[in-house]
Each structure stands twice: as structure tokens, then as C-alpha cells.
Amino acid sequence: MNYQRLAQLQKLVPQMRQVKRIHFIGIGGVGMSGIAKILLHEGYQISGSDLVQNKVTKHLVALGVSIKFQHIPENVLDANVVVVSSAISIANPEIVAAKKLRIPIITRAEMLAELMRFRYGIAIAGTHGKTTTTAMLASIYLEAGLDPTIVNGGLIKSIGQYARLGYGSYLIAEADESDLSFLHLQPIVTIITNIEADHMENYQGDFNYLKNTFLKFIHKLPFYGKGIMCLDDPVIRDLLPHISRHIITYGFNSKANFRLTNYHQKEAHVSFQLYRQDKPTLRIELNSPGRHNALNAVAAIAVATEEGIADKNILQALFRFKGINRRFDKLGCFSLKKINGKNGVVMLVEDYGHHPTELQATIQSVRIGWPDKRLVMVFQPHRYTRTRDLYEYFVGVLSKVDVLLMLDIYPAGENPIAGIDSKSLCCTIRNTSKLDPIFIHELNKLPVMLAQLLQDNDLVLMQGAGSIGLIASQLAIGKLQTNIRHNPLI
């Protein structure tokens, strides 16, 4: 540990050092746990509560965090400040107790903003791609020896963490637009990857409200700050005339300041040329498939180039980039002989994408990189509201796979909506396309159903943001077969 740098951090805001114990309600979530871990390493006493034990809570307990697995008023008695997840109800007994005791209650984003306030903040926002872009940018800064603090929404495989405390001056963070909480942040540099209708329940169902919120976010930049924005995105192009900050664009668009061309993909390996204004052209090589990941990489390159990071560090970091957990995550290759007695091998991949645009990008990536494979998708829709709002879009995109198995909608805390369910979605796809989806209501039937239909050279894509991640892991460790040969992760 860099004790000298830690001492410097502790002197930045002496008033905050008066805070001894910080309590997190819902500490088991990825976003909450990352910030808790950073504050723990900064020297604060951290406690938390959650209803479920998981890998995250076990890791925090091993680091010395005190976690109670029930929400009771006693948990907050000695806290100086309480940090709450957006998933926590205001009726939570710990919140009620904190209010009675006049203990300050803040959101996760407010605490992240406090961490960013005395660092060089770089915030990555957008409907799609922000987690991967954050990880790519963090990897470049690590390669360059800049030792950044990192707060991400996905596990970065190369460091095995969602978040880390660095002793350099940079804080690289994923900015969450889902509940407008990113408006608390005041970064020096911002990336906006794209803007699309999602989480509309938090925007009163008004897309203009969503657009204007992103406009407010970009104007959180100081006058000397920089906004990095994707010119391929039509909503971003529409917003550009209304922005009064320094903007640098990127994309396949011929007018972009950082322009991709000559894109090639073979399996997971991607290469392309990158033209940069007043800078040498770069040949980029990635092991993250898809045009969407090429765009994510260019967003990171644009920031790194503007910040003066050497090209060799950029190229090396991106080539070595191992990806994000649950983002086109190759879990292994499996012999069919032990699954259904047939000859051949199938490949199992997990992907977190749950918006139809994300599904479309992943399907396109498979078609380009593995053109000879039959694409078998197991999809778990995420949220009733998203399924309702994007129903026709889902129908069109899901119709493009070769075989579709669909699980029940993962509610993510939502109540069911009449007429919005996976069985109806399957019926609509069946009636409007050549595809005959298979609806699976009972999860224990999934391995049997897969075994019946799998063929040599299939690519099985476990798609979704809910419990399907656990299902994919179970399949990979032996529920689908007992003797597994793992390939290196992509």
C-alpha cells in the first residue's frame, strides 16, 4: 500500500475524516460494494447490510467489513453516514431509523461524486457499452502506470475486481443514467457512448426528458473539460448543436474526429484502422468481438490520446484486454458425446445484454465472427416494463437467431404486467417469423431440452441480465455434462 499517497488523500478533506463509520444498505450489489471497498482502503470503518450472502459479501467480509444479513434499525446506530442503493425502499427499517437519529442518508452516486471531487474524474455514460468502455480505459491507464482509482459495473477480468483504489490522481468511473443519479457527478472528462430509450419508468416515459438529462450531464463538465461522444448515434448528433462544451467525436462516421475503418473480425479477434486528427493512424487489434466493442475501444483511445498517453501503452492494453465478466464471456467448449451421444463440439457463451440493441449487436458479432455456427440462444427477458416498452423490437431481433429457447421474465423487483410475458413473446415471434421458439417455464428442464436439440458446431448463447448468469455457470461446471474441456477465455 502507498501510505504516503493515502496520507495525502486523507488530508484533502479533513472534515470528512471526522466520519468514522460509513454504513451501506444493500452492500451486496456491484455498485455499492465497489465504493465500500475503496472507502475501506482509504481508512474508513465500513459496515453494511443485505438480505443475501453472495461472492461479493464474502469478499468484503474477508477484507474486514462488518455485514449483517438482515435489515434492522440496530445496524445504523453507530453510523456517521448511511449510503443507500437505489433498489432500497424508503420504508426500509434502517432508513427509518437513520432519519429518526438524524444520520445523513446519501445515495451511492453522491458518495461516488465525493470520491471524484478531489480527483481527476473521468465518467463513462451511455445506454450501452459503458461498462466495457470503462474497463478498456482503466486498462490503458494501468498499462501507462497512472495507477487510477476504478469504479465499474462489471468485473474486469485482468484485475479480477469491479473497483480498486489507486494512488494516482485519476478516478475512472461508470456513470449510471438509469435513475438520473449520474447528475451528481462532476467529471473533467466524459464519454457518452450512445443514448436510447431504456429505464423509461424513471423518465416519466418521456424520451425528451431522457435526452435533456444527458444534455445536463454533459454540461456538468467544467469549461476546460472534454466530452467524448459517438457520432454514429443519431440522438447524440441531434444534441451536438445544443452543447457548449469542447466535444471530440468518434465512430465509423466519416466526419468523426476519431474514425474507424477497415474493420475485420475472425472469431473473437478484431482489427481495424483508426484515423486521428493530427495524430498518426493506428492499427488496433482486440480480442473483444463485435463492431460495438471496436467503438468502445475507440472511445477509450480518444480519451487516452487527448490525455497524452503513449500509443504503445494504448495498443498493448487493448490487445491484452481480457474483457468483462458476463460480456460475451466464453465459458467453454463441450463434447456432445457426453451430452446426447452425438459426435461434435458445442461452444457455450454468456452475455449480459438485455436490451434489443445489445442483443442485435451480439447476434451480428456471432454472424461475422463465427459464420459457420448455428446460433442457439437461451434468453431471459429482464423487467416487465422493458419487455412491454420494446416488445416489437424484441420480436424483430430475437427472430434472427437459429434456435430460441426463452425463460420467464426476470422481474428485477417489478410486478407482473397483464399480457406481458415470455409465452406471449414466443407466440408473437412464431406468428411473425419462420422461427419456432421454445418456452421453458421450469428451469430444471433446460439442460434436458438443450441436450435434445444441440448439434455439432452449435454456439449456445446464454443471454440476459438476471438469474440466467447463475444458470450459465451451472451448465458450465457440469449440469450440462460432467467432463468439460475449457478453452482460454476470450
From Swiss-Prot:
One of its GO terms (biological process) is regulation of cell shape. Pathway: Cell wall biogenesis; peptidoglycan biosynthesis. Keywords: ATP-binding, Cell cycle, Cell division, Cell shape, Cell wall biogenesis/degradation, Cytoplasm, Ligase, Nucleotide-binding, Peptidoglycan synthesis. Its EC number is 6.3.2.8. GO terms for cellular component: cytoplasm. ATP binds at G126, T127, H128, G129, K130, T131, T132. Cell wall formation. Belongs to the MurCDEF family. This is UDP-N-acetylmuramate--L-alanine ligase. The lineage of its organism: Bacteria, Pseudomonadati, Pseudomonadota, Gammaproteobacteria, Candidatus Palibaumannia. The gene is murC.
